[in-house]
């Protein structure tokens, strides 16, 4: 190859979420909990879901077909396709293999599926970037699909569900460039959330422990990122420049080097706490900074384990980040607020939300931090620079309009019934879905039937 690829990153983004949703305020009444428990306590407004007419195959077929169509992508220009999901329909056959029917005669496409809770999509992104940087690259682009259907058994966790998929076109000369060599990861063995029972779509989850794991992972991945950044800056080999930081009128701290951030969003309230947590790291690095004049003195020498759940730490830094959060993080949680947790698609839906809610002119030249977490556990912190126009991506995504138009509110009773319907349909063969095709939007793939050999057949809504 004559020259190595430059500005590797995201060239196009497509998103899909089901047309049906339940209002979290209605779910509060239905569940008999206090008003605001889900809407304020979790920071959630709506939750997307689907019945037995849709599954991870249909989600992925829909989002990839729309990516190819809406960006006029030649299927022969794709040399890698990788899927990140934890929604498993088959213990052997990959979702990627199902998607091959969209690529015609182009059978020379690398990649399969990546599985680790909500982290699979991020691993697929890293793999695809690594492929383009490697000697194995053949000059073509790659596609990453991240998607899931998040369902929980009845109880406290059920309102933290959601459903959706994101497809990313990755290649050189991209407008949204991943900063080369600059990421930090944290991997541990933990039983915070896991799915050992293959007869059920529902996970085993320890909610409080999982939040603790998420926070520790954020701390460690961010520290690893900062260490790597310092090394690369010293070596002057990474070629990135610091962001220009959205002006907030507040004293500057290292966190201000990110103009915007996107986080994996189990709940939007956790995202707000996580952004505040990053400022806590800045405080520990430089407690004498004028930015931290109002921080209580006892915070300085607090034991690390205690800091993970300490309300003084949480409240102090959430107060300090309130204004910056609205400017820098809120644009990235609009999808999560209105759709819920899309698992693997969550953080990439956050990036899509950000691109769709910030004017392309204001995004140009900016720096985006991104934190991805998957239970069990795997986590990474990385960053992007916007070096080209995101206008076409924003126009195609049209998320502000999509979140309102063509969506149908369903009462909690119907949502409950549809959860039971999915439970009934799980692992069935010789099965005809009962869900109404009328709820499916045009251009969306849906399940027609499953034969007596478990083979699944789909149609596209006209």
Cite the ranges covered by each PLM segment.
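Condensing-enzyme catalytic core mediating Claisen C-C bond formation in acyl metabolism
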Residues: 1-53, 157-247, 377, 381-462
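Conserved beta-ketoacyl condensing-enzyme motif
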Residues: 10, 55-122, 244-247, 252-277, ...
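Acidic, glycine-rich active-site loops and adjacent beta-strand->loop/helix elements
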Residues: 14-16, 83-90, 116-121, 145-151, ...
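Conserved catalytic cysteine-centered active-site region
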Residues: 37-41, 45-58, 86-141, 281-346
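Cysteine-centered functional microenvironments
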Residues: 109-123, 155-158, 202-210, 257-261, ...
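Flexible, glycine-rich active-site loops centered on histidine and acidic residues
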Residues: 133-168
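A conserved active-site cap/scaffold subdomain adjacent to cofactor or substrate pockets
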Residues: 211-243, 251-258, 262-290, 297-298
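C-terminal catalytic subdomain
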Residues: 302-311, 326-408
């Amino acid at each position: 190859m004559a020259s190595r690829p430059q500005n590797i990153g995201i060239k196009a983004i497509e998103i899909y979420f089901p047309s049906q949703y339940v209002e979290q305020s209605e779910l509060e009444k239905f569940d008999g909990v206090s008003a605001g428990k889900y809407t304020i306590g979790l920071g959630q407004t709506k939750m997307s879901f689907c019945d037995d007419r849709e599954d991870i195959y249909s989600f992925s077929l829909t989002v990839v077909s729309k990516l190819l169509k809406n960006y006029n992508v030649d299927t022969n220009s794709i040399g890698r396709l990788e899927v990140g999901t934890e929604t498993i329909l088959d213990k052997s056959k990959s979702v990627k293999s199902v998607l091959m029917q969209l690529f015609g005669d182009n059978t020379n496409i690398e990649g399969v599926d990546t599985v680790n809770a909500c982290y699979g999509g991020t691993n697929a992104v890293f793999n695809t970037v690594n492929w383009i940087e490697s000697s194995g690259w053949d000059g073509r682009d790659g596609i990453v699909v991240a998607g899931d259907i998040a369902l929980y058994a009845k109880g406290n966790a059920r309102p933290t569900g959601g459903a959706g998929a994101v497809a990313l076109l990755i290649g050189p000369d991209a407008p949204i460039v991943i900063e080369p060599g600059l990421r930090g990861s944290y991997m541990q063995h933990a039983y915070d959330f896991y799915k050992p029972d293959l007869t059920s779509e529902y996970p085993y989850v320890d909610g409080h422990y999982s939040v603790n794991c998420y926070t520790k992972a954020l701390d460690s991945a961010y520290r690893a990122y900062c260490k790597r950044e310092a090394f690369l800056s010293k070596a002057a080999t990474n070629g990135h420049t610091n962001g220009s930081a959205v002006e907030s009128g507040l004293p500057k701290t290292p966190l201000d080097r990110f103009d915007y951030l996107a986080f994996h969003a189990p709940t939007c309230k956790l995202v707000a706490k996580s952004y505040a947590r990053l400022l806590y790291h800045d405080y520990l690095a430089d407690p004498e900074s004028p930015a931290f004049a109002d921080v209580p003195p006892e915070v300085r020498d607090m034991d690390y384990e205690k800091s993970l759940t300490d309300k003084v730490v949480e409240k102090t830094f959430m107060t300090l980040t309130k204004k910056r959060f609205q400017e820098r993080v809120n644009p990235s949680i609009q999808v999560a607020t209105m759709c819920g947790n899309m698992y693997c698609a969550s953080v990439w839906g956050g990036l899509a939300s950000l691109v769709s809610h910030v004017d392309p002119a204001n995004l140009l030249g900016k720096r985006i931090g991104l934190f991805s977490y998957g239970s069990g556990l795997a986590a990474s912190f990385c960053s992007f620079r916007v070096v080209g126009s995101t206008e076409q991506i924003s126009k195609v995504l049209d998320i502000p309009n999509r979140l309102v138009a063509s969506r149908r509110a369903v009462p909690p009773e119907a949502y409950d019934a549809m959860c039971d319907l999915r439970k009934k349909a799980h692992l069935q063969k010789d099965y005809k879905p009962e869900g109404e095709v009328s709820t499916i939007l045009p251009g969306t793939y849906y399940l027609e039937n499953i034969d007596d050999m478990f083979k699944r057949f789909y149609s596209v809504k006209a």
